[in-house]
Amino acid sequence: MDGKVGNTATGCPVMHGGMTSAETSNTAWWPNALNLDILHQHDTKTNPMGKNFNYREEVKKLDFEALKKDLHALMTDSQPWWPADWGHYGGLMIRMSWHAAGSYRVADGRGGAGTGNQRFAPLNSWPDNVNLDKARRLLWPIKKKYGNKISWADLIALAGTIAYESMGLKTFGFGFGREDIWHPEKDVYWGSEQEWLGAKRYDGKSRESLENPLAAVQMGLIYVNPEGVNGQPDPLRTAQDVRVTFGRMAMNDEETVALTAGGHTVGKCHGNGNAKFLGPDPEAADVEDQGLGWINKTTRGIGRNTVSSGIEGAWTTHPTQWDNGYFYLLLNYDWELKKSPAGAWQWEPIHIKEEDKPVDVEDPAIRRNPIMTDADMAIKMDPVYRKIAERFYKDPDYFAEVFARAWFKLTHRDMGPKTRYIGPDVPKEDLIWQDPVPAGNRAYDIAAAKAKIAASNLTIGEMVSTAWDSARTFRGSDKRGGANGARIRLKPQKDWEGNEPQRLTKVLRILESIAADTGASVADVIVLAGNVGIEKAAKAAGFDIIVPFAPGRGDATDDMTDAESFDVLEPLHDGYRNWLKKAYDVRPEELMLDRTQLMGLTAHEMTVLVGGLRVLGTNHNNTQHGVFTDRVGALTNDFFVNLTDMANVWIPSKDNLYEIRDRKTGNIKWTATRVDLVFGSNSILRSYAEVYAQDDNKEKFVKDFVAAWTKIMNADRFDLA
């Protein structure tokens, strides 16, 4: 039913059905309205497991060795409905794991293997993911057997790792702990294109102009087009795409070559047929197809006749074993462009020895030409990549080690710090990309530290702003950032414009001294100072409260910090502190919404935090926009009271600023930004603002503010879970 009137024998029998399609949704009627849906994802209404289910505890009960044994057996248990190439599913499973993890992009931390999102649209139906639905169906008996003790997210990531082990690679390790989502993600921007393989994401001729935060060159691809830029072979141009996209997945040149080569050491591409015979993707398939897509109902369409990418062939002589054959073929042969049976561009070797050809996937008496994609040829022809490839070719052990580490990074990049890894195969080594933080001291006199903070000459605004700036970098997407580690005192964070370096230096000097005197970490004292400021402000508003505090944060060092990797965490805007670094094409309220989602806040938590921070005097550079109170420093609900007061009128001024005037006299009372006024203009946010403006909700406002504040301060305290 889609809500349409049904008055014929073939129409919907319900006169006013529920709206089950998007044709007449609110966003269709009002496409420019602020869409708060990204803040209301993945709650108990979509999760069938119930609010008391804790996957991170459940997975600890898993028989890890039995699971791995079953996965090893799966690799060579070929099923007639989807036969394994050469009797081994390793290549398919690796592609599935790679394409789950490879959707990660460092700019906003979204994508990646951490949620099992490959089960849902749009990823389950991307052109680059053709036939990965078959890989997940092959895993279903194992998922069914181990049930709640293994998430789809963990199983999808683990399958590729076990596949490599089964083909002879010594892997670096594996950490469990990825929790499944149960609904397509609404917050991830995959691009603006309205058609598959669209490439309207460049604002210039340079391949570096790829739109942020995207890390793929076309809609529906994981990284680059394997045939070449926009489907036109040109290895040196493709090398530019490879460098940009892998860089945006947090990989350097050596890791890029290792991952490309290691991913193509095993398995094959599939294009031995006509793609026009493929049925619709899983989301568009008929109900009888039961969630499977790209079904060929015209020709055989399986085994040697499978069509996926359209390119046809294996990269190496022995596609079911880990070896150095990729570099042997790539570097020792000349290659020429040809078309696959499906019509895709691919590179094939000139005058190849018969014994260097891989055998047919079904008949070992037949040998086939190996192939290379344009991305593979980029490794050969780009001088930087070529040098790395030659080193790997000469030193297979080094290649295997670099690849194993890069594969581990790829499949764990969005899991956050090592403390979140579960299981017997977690590597002991701390890796700098994990943003390590040492354990902090829990056994110090918290009351004494609070007393010293309260006795300092720091203002409420200084204390609260510093704590907020330290914690606001947290991203729930890849679990990076946050207050733990106190990296706000290190490069690059101490110099970020959004952190007001001059003010920050003054505050840190005082707080570091208090930390030294009390035995607390600086990270703890920064958060504690924010709490002290809030307690003071609440008291000024007539409420005695204690802001919850959990000691034990550690202090990271420069040696533990890859400064360059933190550049992507720099706030370029902060609606909570009413600040924009510069004017952007995106509306300020939308930027705030994106930051809110990354921090893991709900719409009403966002509302109460903005209203509270305004009256505490925390605006960047002490601007007065949105400070709708004459009691700055008191935790009152004045922001909401005055925002909703019809004695006021709101008049545009300049540069997205507004004047709030007395409706009778016309006198200017306050100034505001779009971020301030959206809490009165958006119908949903206004409903929250009205709750907090009520005369009987002054205490509720304070309690809700403290709860939301504490949530942010502890967002990265995975040790408390």
Swiss-Prot record:
<comment type="function">
    <text>Bifunctional enzyme with both catalase and broad-spectrum peroxidase activity.</text>
</comment>
<keyword id="KW-0376">Hydrogen peroxide</keyword>
<comment type="similarity">
    <text>Belongs to the peroxidase family. Peroxidase/catalase subfamily.</text>
</comment>
<keyword id="KW-0479">Metal-binding</keyword>
<dbReference type="GO" id="GO:0042744">
    <property type="term" value="P:hydrogen peroxide catabolic process"/>
</dbReference>
<dbReference type="GO" id="GO:0070301">
    <property type="term" value="P:cellular response to hydrogen peroxide"/>
</dbReference>
<dbReference type="Pfam" id="PF00141">
    <property type="entry name" value="peroxidase"/>
</dbReference>
<feature type="cross-link" description="Tryptophyl-tyrosyl-methioninium (Trp-Tyr) (with M-249)">
    <location>
        <begin position="98"/>
        <end position="223"/>
    </location>
</feature>
<feature type="active site" description="Proton acceptor">
    <location>
        <position position="99"/>
    </location>
</feature>
<dbReference type="InterPro" id="IPR000763">
    <property type="entry name" value="Catalase_peroxidase"/>
</dbReference>
<keyword id="KW-0575">Peroxidase</keyword>
<keyword id="KW-0408">Iron</keyword>
<dbReference type="InterPro" id="IPR019794">
    <property type="entry name" value="Peroxidases_AS"/>
</dbReference>
<dbReference type="InterPro" id="IPR010255">
    <property type="entry name" value="Haem_peroxidase_sf"/>
</dbReference>
<protein>
    <recommendedName>
        <fullName>Catalase-peroxidase 1</fullName>
        <ecNumber>1.11.1.21</ecNumber>
    </recommendedName>
</protein>
<dbReference type="GO" id="GO:0004096">
    <property type="term" value="F:catalase activity"/>
</dbReference>
<dbReference type="GO" id="GO:0046872">
    <property type="term" value="F:metal ion binding"/>
</dbReference>
<dbReference type="GO" id="GO:0005829">
    <property type="term" value="C:cytosol"/>
</dbReference>
<feature type="site" description="Transition state stabilizer">
    <location>
        <position position="95"/>
    </location>
</feature>
<feature type="binding site" description="axial binding residue">
    <location>
        <position position="264"/>
    </location>
    <ligand>
        <name>heme b</name>
    </ligand>
</feature>
<dbReference type="GO" id="GO:0020037">
    <property type="term" value="F:heme binding"/>
</dbReference>
<keyword id="KW-0349">Heme</keyword>
<keyword id="KW-0560">Oxidoreductase</keyword>
<dbReference type="InterPro" id="IPR002016">
    <property type="entry name" value="Haem_peroxidase"/>
</dbReference>
<comment type="subunit">
    <text>Homodimer or homotetramer.</text>
</comment>
<feature type="cross-link" description="Tryptophyl-tyrosyl-methioninium (Tyr-Met) (with W-98)">
    <location>
        <begin position="223"/>
        <end position="249"/>
    </location>
</feature>
